[in-house]
Amino acid sequence: MTESPTSPSGTAPTAGAFLDDAALGRLRPLSFAVAYRMLGSVAEAEDVVQEALTRVSQSPDVRNPDAFVTTVTTRIAIDVLRSARVRREQYVGEWLPEPLVGPGSSLPVAMAAPSPDVARHAELADDLSTAFLVLLETLTPTERAAFLLHDVLGFPHSEAADVIGTSEVAARQLASRARRRIARHVAPQQVATQDEAPQHAAPRPPGQDDPAPDALTSRPRTASDRARAEELVSRFLAACEEGAVDSFLELLAEDVVLAGDGGGKVPLGMSIARPVAGRVTVARMLASFVGRGAPLHFERALVGGEPGLLIVADDVVGGGLIGTWSFEVSDGLLAGIRGVINPEKLGHLGQLADLDRLQAALRSALEARTAARRTAARQTADQEPTEN
C-alpha cells in the first residue's frame, strides 16, 4: 500500500512544496516514539526513523505531518518487527526491551510529547515502562500496531486501518485481539476487554471500544502510586547497600519475578539465563549479587519513565554503565524486577563499563574472601584446646 502524504484519512496532495529540515527535525521525536514502541529497540527504531523521514522528505504537500510520519513510521516498523521476531526467538536468554533513561539521557526525544493532533489521548512518556513493552512482545506486528495506534495514540479504527493496510473491521478485531492477549498476562479482575465486559456493565454505543485499562501498562497512575513506587525503589536501594536477605524480603511480592538480559554477551555469573520466581528465591539471589564485593554502585534514575536504578562500575575499574534495573509494582510491593546488562542494548546511554575488568575484580574479591575465611578457620582451630 502506497503512503499518502496526508493524514490516514486525508485527501490526495497536489504537487508543491516539500517539508524543510526544520519541519523534519520537529517530526523526529514523534517518529522515534512510535518506532520504539513498535520495536522495543533503540537501534532498530533509529533506523526506522531515518527511513521514515527520508520518505516524508520526498513527499510534496504533506498536509498533516504528524499523522503522515506516524503512518510511514508504523508501516516500516511492522516490516522490521516481522524479521526481528525471528531473531528474538533465537536470542540467548531472556529478551528484554532496550531501556530508555531520562530525563537527561542521551536520547531526550524519548520523553518528548507529540503534537496533540495525533496523540490526543496519550502522553508518549506514559507508556515506556519495561513491563508494558514486554506485554507488547506477546502481540503480532499488526496487533501491536492496531493496539498502539488506537489505544495509545487515539487513532480511530478507520484511520488505524488505513495505516496498517486493512479494513476498519479487521483493525478493530486486531486491537480487540491484542487486548485479550495482553489481558492473559495481568490479573483477570483488572481487565475487562470489549469482548469480555461484565454483564452488569452499561452498554457501549455501537462501534465504541473500551479504552485500554491502566493495568495493561503496569504503570503508577496517580501521584500516590508514583510516590509509592519511588519509596519502594529507595528502600530497594537501601537493601542493596545493606545486602541482607530480610531487607529484600519485605519489599517483594510472593510471586515476584526476576529477569535478566545479558544476551550471551556478558561474563559467566553476571546475568541469569532465565527468569527466577518466588519471594525467597529472588531475595536470596539479590542478596548474593550485591554481597559479592563487586566494585559497583547504584544510582537513581527514570528507566522507561518509571523510578528505577542504574548499575554503575566504580572508578577503580574504570567506571561506566553496567546495566539498568526497572521495577513493576503491584499492591504496594515489587512484583517484577528486570535487569538489562547486554552491552549491545546500552550503548545509546553513554560510556559502558569494562566487563572483563569488572569480572577480574570480582574474582579477586572472591579469592580474598575465600582466603579470609580459611585464615579465620585456622585461627579458630588453633585456639581450640587439644586433648591430652
Report residues per predicted region.
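Hydrophobic pocket/interface hotspot
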Residues: 248, 256, 332
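Long, low-complexity, intrinsically disordered segments
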Residues: 374-388
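Low-complexity, glycine/alanine/valine/leucine- and proline-rich hydrophobic stretches
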Residues: 280-368, 386-388
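Active-site-adjacent scaffolding segments
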Residues: 1-238, 244
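Generic recognition of short, well-ordered alpha-helical interface segments
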Residues: 231, 243, 277-281
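Amphipathic alpha-helical regulatory segments at dimerization interfaces
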Residues: 235-242, 246-247, 251, 285-288
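A general secondary-structure junction signal
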Residues: 94, 260-263, 302-305
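A solvent-exposed, acidic/Ser-Thr-rich amphipathic alpha-helical stretch
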Residues: 254-299
